[in-house]
Amino acid sequence: MSSGIALAPNCVSTFNDLKLGRKYGGIIYRISDDSKEIIVDSTLPAGCSFDEFTKCLPENECRYVVLDYQYKEEGAQKSKICFVAWCPDTANIKKKMMATSSKDSLRKACVGIQVEIQGTDASEVKDSCFYEKCTKI
């Protein structure tokens, strides 16, 4: 289902800066105040901690996050690009519906995402959840 909400011009270029240049550790996207487009809200520095990522998730508002998730597996340092659809239970129902119906347009435009995670509360966006999903692939 598509909501008709467009992507701001810098959404994909900012993603490519993360994917190709490792310029960022994460990108936080949101729907603009006028509900017309998905915009880059902020970025996380390259090498940011997992705690920095979780602190950027608002308690009552939906966000999309692309995270360059760093982890160790069998002693080797690895990373995967994860897409997080953050839609907390406490968010406004209309905004949750809008965020859910708009997610695919951003997700499909960001070519190279390896893992997708949906979160409605803090228990679904723990480091252990990411690690489990990333090591299954």
UniProtKB/Swiss-Prot annotation:
Domain of life of the native organism: Eukaryota
Record GO biological process: actin filament bundle assembly; actin filament depolymerization; actin filament severing; cell motility; hyperosmotic response; response to bacterium
Keyword field: Actin-binding, Cytoplasm, Cytoskeleton, Nucleus
Subcellular location as annotated: Nucleus matrix; Cytoplasm, Cytoskeleton
Alphabetized GO MF terms: actin filament binding; actin monomer binding
Gene3D superfamilies xref list: Severin
Domain ADF-H: 2-135
UniProt key word Nucleus: yes
InterPro entries: ADF-H, ADF-H/Gelsolin-like_dom_sf, ADF/Cofilin
Pfam families to which the protein is assigned, alphabetical: Cofilin_ADF (PF00241)
CDD domains: ADF_cofilin_like (cd11286)
One GO term describing the cellular component: actin cytoskeleton
PANTHER family per record: COFILIN-RELATED
Membership in a protein family: Belongs to the actin-binding proteins ADF family.
Job of this protein: Controls reversibly actin polymerization and depolymerization in a pH-sensitive manner. It has the ability to bind G- and F-actin in a 1:1 ratio of cofilin to actin. It is the major component of intranuclear and cytoplasmic actin rods.
Protein name: Cofilin-1A
